[in-house]
């Protein structure tokens, strides 16, 4: 089954500052919840660009680390970018990051379309943890 998660938040900063922060893959360490033990292995050194491959490890369950390889598939400077999983824990992963300047800051919207592996077991896991 394919799932969709949408989150929107207002960031009280200019679009240039917000975009610069999110367009720097090294900042993923700060954005990711600490319990995931997120670690960039390769590809996070340069500013984000279409076609960029980023390899990292994450820990979804205690003691179980997973390799995750994503590609920055689309970028429109200052407006949006999309990362797609190429290898990793999900059966499918498509993550849109949208930025809309507004008075006093920026509305940022995350739209994640994803599917878990393992069929029924994956769906039970989704019901318990997501």
Could you tell me what each predicted segment is?
Residues 82-130:
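Beta-strand/loop substructures that line and gate deep hydrophobic ligand-binding cavities in soluble
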Residues 17, 30, 64-66, 93, ...:
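Short acidic, gly/pro-rich beta-turn/loop elements at beta-sheet edges
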Residues 8-12, 39, 57, 71, ...:
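Generic structural detector for well-ordered beta-strands
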Residues 30, 39-87, 103, 107:
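Glycine-rich portal/gate segments that line the openings of hydrophobic small-molecule binding cavities
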Residues 1-49:
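Hydrophobic ligand-binding cavity/cleft-lining segments
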Residues 5-6, 15, 41, 59, ...:
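A general structural-boundary detector
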